[in-house]
């Protein structure tokens, strides 16, 4: 009996389409729906009835139109040409779509994910007779200032019968052939819902440095860790993620705009090409991939966009690179899940979200990690997901589910954002589970007393927050001098250490040696001032000391001048309080 590969539309509910007669179809197969051949994916099967989520607008689709299955899962094409690219949620390049259909995305449009005409300079690193395994490296291709390693597809292994000589090839040309006849190209396909296999996951030991003092010092993230940035609207989630994308120490950045405003993606597209990559000196876009799935694009494609993004990140991880994946925002993704679930008439759980929300979020975040690849390379994917709880309610299901999965929680505060405090991360409401893991690295690479200094700063900020409540009730005059000193030191730490000026070329990003120097300066001021109070100096005399202004200017000092500036301030602190000690 021949299996029928084509069915018909039985009912339509927004992006959810039910098709009858889908014999031989499999879960997560890609289908073409209607005369316009809209792209969809089977998400439930019941006999010959398939439930399809359509990645394009279904307006005008009618009952009885054909539904044809391709027999393949939703896959992305992985190879040279992805860097500097901007795609929609299912890896269709937006510049090619614009050439084909103008400024608006036409329905049913088919464009190649990668440039099939461009020739790449391939240099083989294997030869005929060698045995290759999944994710093994066949050779390299230069892409901008980046060395793109050509990988064997993860499920392929065997002995090489032939390898193409060094030269120029397109992504469709055969560059190697196995003895069993399998042909290998510069690119290969991989299904987005399947994590790429690895040899083993590694214990994280290196920090993912963001250039933001509050994150790198107080709430660090490991290379290969997962962090959440929850916050109400307008608190700076997108700006924080864009800043991490600009200044983070990852080799590759994958930025997924999932259901956010189109203007925010435009900001990225306008800003990133103008930004200089501190590592290479070239444009930052040359190591960035953007996936733009704005709020007015079909809901179902949002659900796919985060999987597309993490699959691209895993591909570069398998080449031995560290990759940062920004998902902005996972709440919009969860809303897409909720809408599709309600269209399919599934039983809702809390706030209408499907019961499997936690499992889906975990499946996404668990694809982060530092790994040893099948070929023996060390790579990492660090995931930073924004969460947009309605009204800033941190008890809503998406925030709570994310909280259980991620290891760093960077809570944004609308009050800080209104006060123009950037980054608006609440130092009393955030935490990182990676701090004890990274203490050894900080001791060896930054300063032997770094963890103790961080702990003291955290303690001072907590004491200041408690005293501020007293000040609001009875005023500052009710406090003793040593308590007023804590409030003054806390203010200095907030304004001159945790706060950064994103528009200042020096202060927008800070290195760890500079952060360490600033920590020592502020804590030395507190220690010397506390001793001076005990020796008879008043708090007003300390507050009026000109050295405070020099401490405030320290963060604007360029890296190459900072050591000399810091030594000068430390000497001045010694001189200022020396007379009091005597």
From Swiss-Prot:
It catalyses: ATP + H2O + 4 H(+)(in) = ADP + phosphate + 5 H(+)(out). ATP binds at residues 231-238. One of its GO terms (molecular function) is proton-transporting ATP synthase activity, rotational mechanism. Its EC number is 7.1.2.2. Keywords: ATP synthesis, ATP-binding, Hydrogen ion transport, Ion transport, Nucleotide-binding, Translocase, Transport. InterPro entries: ATP-synt_VA_C (IPR055190), ATP-synth_a_Xtn (IPR031686), ATP_synth_asu-like_sf (IPR023366), ATPase_a/bsu_AS (IPR020003), ATPase_F1/V1/A1_a/bsu_N (IPR004100), ATPase_F1/V1/A1_a/bsu_N_sf (IPR036121), ATPase_F1/V1/A1_a/bsu_nucl-bd (IPR000194), ATPase_F1/V1_b/a_C (IPR024034). It comes from the Bacteria. GO terms for cellular component: proton-transporting ATP synthase complex. Pfam families: ATP-synt_ab (PF00006), ATP-synt_ab_N (PF02874), ATP-synt_ab_Xtn (PF16886), ATP-synt_VA_C (PF22919). One of its GO terms (biological process) is proton transmembrane transport. SUPFAM superfamilies: C-terminal domain of alpha and beta subunits of F1 ATP synthase, N-terminal domain of alpha and beta subunits of F1 ATP synthase, P-loop containing nucleoside triphosphate hydrolases. Produces ATP from ADP in the presence of a proton gradient across the membrane. The V-type alpha chain is a catalytic subunit. Belongs to the ATPase alpha/beta chains family. This is V-type ATP synthase alpha chain.
């Amino acid at each position: 009996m021949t299996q029928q590969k084509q069915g018909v539309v039985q009912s339509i509910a927004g992006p959810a389409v039910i098709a009858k007669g889908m014999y031989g179809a499999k879960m997560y197969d890609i289908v073409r729906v209607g005369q316009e051949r809209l792209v969809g994916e089977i998400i439930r099967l019941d006999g010959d009835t398939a439930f399809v989520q359509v990645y394009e607008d279904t307006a005008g689709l009618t009952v009885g139109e054909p539904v044809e299955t391709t027999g393949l899962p939703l896959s992305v094409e992985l190879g040279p040409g992805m860097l500097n690219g901007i795609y929609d949620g299912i890896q269709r390049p937006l510049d090619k779509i614009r050439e084909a259909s103008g400024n608006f995305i036409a329905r049913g449009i088919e464009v190649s994910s990668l440039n099939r005409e461009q020739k790449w300079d391939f240099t083989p690193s294997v030869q005929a007779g060698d045995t290759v395994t999944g994710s093994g490296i066949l050779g390299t291709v230069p892409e901008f200032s980046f060395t793109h390693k050509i990988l064997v597809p993860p499920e392929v292994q065997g002995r090489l019968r032939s390898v193409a000589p060094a030269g120029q090839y397109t992504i469709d040309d055969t560059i190697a052939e196995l003895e069993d006849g399998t042909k290998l190209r510069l690119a290969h396909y991989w299904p987005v819902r399947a994590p790429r296999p690895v040899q083993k996951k590694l214990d994280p030991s290196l920090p993912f440095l963001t250039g933001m003092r509050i994150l790198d010092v107080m709430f660090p993230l490991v290379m290969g860790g997962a962090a959440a940035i929850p916050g109400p609207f307008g608190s700076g989630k997108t700006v924080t993620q864009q800043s991490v994308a600009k200044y983070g120490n990852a080799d590759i950045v994958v930025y997924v705009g999932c259901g956010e405003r189109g203007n925010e993606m435009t900001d990225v597209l306008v800003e990133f090409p103008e930004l200089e990559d501190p590592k290479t000196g070239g444009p930052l876009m040359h190591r960035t991939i953007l996936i733009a799935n704005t709020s007015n694009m079909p809901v179902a494609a949002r659900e796919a966009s985060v999987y597309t993004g993490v699959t691209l990140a895993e591909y570069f991880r398998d080449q031995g690179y560290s990759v940062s994946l920004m998902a902005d925002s996972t709440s919009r993704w969860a809303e897409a899940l909720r809408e599709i679930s309600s269209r399919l008439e599934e039983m809702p759980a809390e706030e209408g979200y499907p019961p499997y929300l936690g499992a889906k979020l975990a499946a996404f975040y668990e694809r982060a990690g530092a790994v040893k690849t099948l070929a023996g390379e060390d790579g990492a994917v660090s995931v930073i997901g924004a969460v947009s709880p309605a009204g800033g309610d941190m008890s809503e299901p998406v925030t709570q589910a994310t909280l259980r999965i991620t290891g760093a929680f960077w809570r944004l505060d609308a009050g800080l954002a209104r006060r123009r405090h950037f980054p608006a991360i609440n130092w009393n409401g955030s935490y990182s589970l990676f701090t004890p893991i990274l203490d050894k690295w900080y001791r060896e690479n930054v300063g032997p007393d770094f963890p103790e200094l961080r702990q003291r700063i955290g303690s001072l900020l907590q004491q200041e927050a408690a005293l501020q409540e007293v000040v609001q009730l009875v005023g500052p005059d009710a406090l003793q001098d040593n308590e007023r000193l804590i409030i003054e030191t806390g203010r200095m730490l907030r304004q001159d250490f945790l706060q950064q000026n994103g528009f200042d070329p020096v202060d927008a990003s800070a290195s760890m040696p500079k952060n360490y120097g600033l920590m020592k300066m502020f804590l030395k001021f507190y220690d010397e001032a506390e001793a001076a109070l005990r020796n008879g100096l008043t708090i007003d005399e300390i507050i009026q000391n000109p050295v405070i202004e020099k401490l405030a200017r320290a963060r604007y000092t360029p890296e190459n001048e900072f050591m000399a500036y810091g030594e000068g301030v430390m000497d001045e602190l010694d001189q200022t309080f020396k007379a009091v000690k005597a």
